[in-house]
Amino acid sequence: TALGHSASKAEDATIDYLQSDGAYSAHQHRQLKMLHEMNTRHFEKSQDPQLDGVIRSYELAARMQGVAPELIDLSNESERTRNLYGMDRKETLDFGHRCLLARRFCEAGVRYIQVSTPYVWDQHNNLVKGHTRNALSVDKPISGLLEDLKQRGMFDDTLVVWGTEFGRTPVVQGKNGRDHNPAGFTVWLSGAGVRAGFSYGSTDEFGYFAQDN
């Protein structure tokens, strides 16, 4: 389920159609109960597995309406925690917000969480300036997330994967930029028993092509 999109501000992100008119009112409870009874009776006759999936999706949506609004509300997070994620600085505020949301969803038992950045990394020009700015925006928040997971006893049970769809070429393109390079780039993992300091595979001397594993 998407919470906003990568181009939107984290503070404005919400789940589409999360709230309906009179959410969790007695009237809505009656509607959901009647819908469940009708779907269940139909499933007993047809044994259609797709209908079973529909029933479970409605049940999940109803539970999300009750839980998700609280999860995306950061008002009860302390100033210390916000600062840990870099939310006290303009450069790191947005991605810090995203990483803090990820920790809250992890605490709630969400099994897979994707945290995205805006589409600002495609540096076909001015790579040094652009990547310096972009790296600054994510370094503090992601380190804050890792530290927060550790201090809450969640680090050893949470696999954090930092990756991208491709890297950049080691040769110049345009005005001091770099082209896409899917042939050799880095992904790092942390937590969940991953061995610290271990690297797998290597590239050639220019960092252009993967040559081992």
What does each model-found stretch correspond to?
Residues 1-213:
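Ligand-binding pockets and gating/stacking loops
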